Amino acid sequence: MIPKFLLRKTQCYHSGNLCKKKSYTELHRVLTKNHRVKFIFTFIFLLALGTASLAQQKVNWNGYMQYRFSDNYLNQTEFSVRRAKFWVNGLIPEEDGSWSYKLQANFLQQVKYQFLLQDVLVNYKINNFEVTAGQFVPDFSLQRKQPDYAIPLDERADVVNALVPGAETMARDIGVELKLDDSKTGSFSFGFFNGNGANTVSNQRNFLYVNRGSLFLLNNPESKLELGYNLSYRDAHNIQFSKIYGNNYAFTGNDFRFGFEEKLNLGAFELQSEYIEAHLGNQKAYGYYALADYLFVSKNLVTLSVEQLYDLNPSTINDPWYVVGYSYLIKGNNIKISLDNKFQFASNKTNALTTLQIQYFFN
């Protein structure tokens, strides 16, 4: 689907430079309002690399780039670097469990390709139980927890990008999360976070609480069926929800969100869907997506999807989007070429977006 920021960008071309400037600078304003925090995280990142090198521990580094061409058939035709991510991680095994860490950064086009830290975390795991602390993506929404390089389409659904709790700051927050994960029966997690996003110092005493659970109804090598739910709550104070309300709106009040999810695997066929609802005070934003894909001859992936988001911004169009996607897996997800065609049939016009993307892993 066409992300909401692209729709706002398209509308702004018809309303002058002021709106266009606001659309581009909103994420930049959110992510850079505390430069000291960015400096501290960068220092930790470099210190971790140096410490690992001095200790002669093996540090695993990884990275990938998504380079794309897109055309909305109206006023936007461009080449862009959608993502350029780099991360290091390591594992320290112990007799009664194992410690691991991860530090990940991304060059974001939306903020003029600034180098921003996304994940700074440490994890302890023993058997099926694990604890994660730091800055990372809270366990809310099936598709949001799936890596963007592994999803069958070029972008996650609008409802996921807009309604997960940390949507305004790369879906990340700072906190602690406990998780019990059994590969045969399902998983259960509970976490509490600052609640005002990534790379940001908390200025309140009210946490964001997140809970997710899933259960396998069918689980064997040939077929799997998993159902799940998501819950989150925070007492929000002056938090920007631009992906729900639009720019320059700060929300204060009860923020309660929930969702349901489903994933079915039958050999080369996969069906996945989610419904998410956000209650902000006495207002409600909600939406869904349903996605089906089939892998032909191990390298050809065909995807069909439909999604719809009802936000609280009166200037956006709420009609559903339909997607037809094709990916050629040259070397699995390590080298992949994909073509997505997205359509929205509004009351007075048809919106469309075509995206051609190449994904390449550096390591």
Predicted segments, located by residue:
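Outer membrane beta-barrel
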Residues: 57-195, 205-210, 214-221, 226, ...
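Short, low-complexity, charge-dense intrinsically disordered segments
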Residues: 1-19, 23-39, 46-47
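C-terminal hydrophobic structural anchor segments
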Residues: 293, 297-345
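Extracytoplasmic loops and strand-loop junctions of Gram-negative outer membrane beta-barrel proteins
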Residues: 69, 157-162, 240-246, 340-342
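Outer-membrane beta-barrel "beta-signal"
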Residues: 213, 326-330, 335, 350-363
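Sec/Tat signal peptide C-region and signal peptidase I cleavage site
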Residues: 51-55
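Detector for outer-membrane/organellar transmembrane beta-barrel domains
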Residues: 215-312
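Solvent-exposed loop/turn segments connecting transmembrane beta-strands
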Residues: 73-78, 105-115, 168-170, 198-205, ...
